[in-house]
Amino acid sequence: MQVSVEATQGLERRLTISVPAEQIEKLVKDSLQREAKRARIPGFRPGKVPVTVINKRYGAAIRQDITGEVMQRNFIEAIIAEKLNPAGAPTFIPGSTDSEKFEFVATFEIYPEVELKGLDAIEVEQPKASVTDADVDSMIETLRKQHATYAAVEREAADGDKVKMNFVGSVDGEEFEGGKAEDFELQLGSGRMIPGFEAGILGHKAGEEFVIDVNFPEEYHAENLKGKAAKFAITLTEVQAANLPEVNDEFAALFGINEGGLEALKTEIRKNMNRELEQALKANVKEQVIAGLLANNDIELPKALIDGEVNVLRQQAMQRFGGQTANMPELPAELFTEQAARRVKIGLLLGEVIKTNELKAEDERVQGLIASMASAYEDPSEVIAYYNSNKELMQNMRNVALEEQAVEALLKSAKVTEKEVAFEEFMNKATGRA
């Protein structure tokens, strides 16, 4: 086998490989003979079909298969010999064939050489938060509201009430599409409607008819309504006030707490809040570390890896539509290219961190991650056993553990400052509610 390597552009490489023609001819001959022994062709006894007949019928297909196998095998031998690391499947182009040699070209991309830079310039503001008694009480109040019952009242509508209404919206005296509704239910303070709409209902009683003036936001989804002043003629048909359940052992039973009553519920709530806080704190620090790593390291990305990641993201997006994808056109790659490139870059950089620091997934950490995830389920031991018996899930957890270890390695050289934050403030920002 003879090999020449050419760097074409960027990460692309072109291998020109020559193999002795007799190697292919021998493989073709052997394959034809094997086929002759097992072929069943009318007019010939089993195992007695002449090779010339087999060659006439199947020769072209057999030669094509053998050629493909030869190219694949010699390509692998060539990249090992040349110490090349392909970042995707090669494209084979069969070339000239004469009595002495068969030549073909393999084109592919290689992984970039990654040299980590600016690790000591990464800046991280590490939040410090804890779950207080007041935070637990606030969560219980939220749970009370979620389990509230509503009853009609003969008073003015207030924040937190549910109301029923009929309304007709107009712009410049003309009704607009989607601006009319009957028996419309709305919880005041939910923020579901455009600014000013809910506030305009406060202080009104059931049976009242009134008009409120509002302005559609400039970023409103309907082009014809962006930034427009509008009037809504409203007939308020019902005002309902919330009746919150008392906080006692019966309240605890609503959440499956059958022993220990209210104190057991508070313990469970605190445990869940601590778990969510720990996950959010880790995610916040990781996000900052990754952002710094990306900002300080510019590397060339193999298109093959980006294309592969685009396909993964596209598939995930299609799955979110459930069974409604049969008649949908394929989502364009451009929708996912930027996110895919970012994910590929993160993977390559973290891979280099893992390699440089000789990191291996710590078993104790892996089991800790599984236990933390399983604690959210009714029977954690069953979930833990399921993960430990599933190779794919365990590999996913090892990858998560390795990422954590890589982030921790980067933190050692980063500029880290600690900042005390309140639980509610931090979690609102983490979940996008701030």
UniProtKB/Swiss-Prot annotation:
Membrane-crossing segments per the record? none
Specify whether Iron is a keyword of the entry: no
User: What biological-process GO terms show up in the record?
Assistant: 'de novo' cotranslational protein folding; cell division; chaperone-mediated protein folding; protein transport; protein unfolding
**Pfam families this protein is in?**
FKBP_C, Trigger_C, Trigger_N
Is Nucleus one of the keywords? no
Signal peptide residue numbers: none
Q: What is this protein called?
A: Trigger factor
Please give the organism.
Answer: Shewanella putrefaciens (strain CN-32 / ATCC BAA-453)
**Taxonomic path:** Bacteria, Pseudomonadati, Pseudomonadota, Gammaproteobacteria, Alteromonadales
- Give the gene symbol: tig
